[in-house]
Amino acid sequence: KASLSSDKINDLRINLIEEELNEFKEAILKKDLKEVADALTDILYVTYGAGHAFGINLDDCFEEVQKSNMSKLGDDGKPIYDEKGKVMKGPKYFKPDLTKFL
């Protein structure tokens, strides 16, 4: 069963993800694609580690969120964008139910 851990472990997981996110930001600013790839991979690695520490199967969660995101498409099967380029919720949108994986 999924659960949060001790404050020490929770803080560690937060710090690891923040550290990798900061490395990603630095790589973007430096326009260093190799370091961007490295940082993104490290973000995934520490995120999956956090999921494991909390007993959360992130593959199952990702699949559910992917299905939800695909439900945002319009009736024509194409994304609906706002003025900033963000995909909006379409008429068949459903909110992902992650509780079934906890």
Spans of model-derived segments:
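Flexible "arm" and connector segments at domain edges
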Residues: 1-40, 44-102
